[in-house]
Amino acid sequence: MINEIKKDTQERMEKSLEALKGHISKIRTGRAQPSLLDAIQVEYYGSATPLRQLANVVAEDARTLAVTVFDRSLISAVEKAILTSDLGLNPSSAGTTIRVPLPPLTEERRRDLIKIVKGEGEQGKVSIRNIRRDANDKIKTLEKEKQISENDERKAQDDIQKITDIYIKKVDEILADKEKELMDF
C-alpha cells in the first residue's frame, strides 16, 4: 500500500517536472529553437491549426528558424500567423521556405524572461509540494484506519520527503540551466 503511494507520488512529480520543462522550453532565449513556434496557430480552411501540422520547423543556425510549409498556398497565412504572434518575430518568405530571424535579446528583456522562468519554477515547486501533501494525507489516513503503524507512517513520510527533495532539486537545476542559457546568449 505504501509502495503504491510512493510510486504514484513519484509518477505525479515526474509529470509536474515534464510540464515545467515544456513551459520553460517555450520561453525564448537568443538561440533558435523549433519549439519556439509550437504555440502558433494558423488559419487553415476556417479553423485554427497548429503550425507544426502545416509545416516543418528547423533551426537553420543559432539565430534563424526555417519554416518549410507543406502547402504553397499557405505561405502567406503562416507568415501572417508568425508576424501577429506575441513573439515579436519578423518572418520573410523565400520560395516555399519562410525564414524567421531571431532578434538579439536586450539585457532588460533577459531579466524579464528570468523573472518569468523563476515564476514557472515556483509553480513547479508548489505543484510538487501539493503532491507531497496528498501523499502524506493518504499515509495519515492509512495510519488512522490502523492499516499501518505509527513507525511505518513516519518512515513513509520521510521517504516521501526524500522524493520531494529530489524533485525540488531537479526543478532548481532546470531553472539554473535556463537562467544560464538566457544570460549567456
Swiss-Prot record:
Protein task: Responsible for the release of ribosomes from messenger RNA at the termination of protein biosynthesis. May increase the efficiency of translation by recycling ribosomes from one round of translation to another.
Keywords linked to the UniProt accession: Cytoplasm, Protein biosynthesis
Subcellular location: Cytoplasm
Record protein name field: Ribosome-recycling factor
Organism: Glaesserella parasuis serovar 5 (strain SH0165) (Haemophilus parasuis)
HAMAP family, alphabetized: RRF (MF_00040)
Molecular function (Gene Ontology), one example: ribosomal large subunit binding
Entry's family note: Belongs to the RRF family.
GO annotation, cellular component aspect: cytosol
Any one of the GO BP annotations: cytoplasmic translational termination
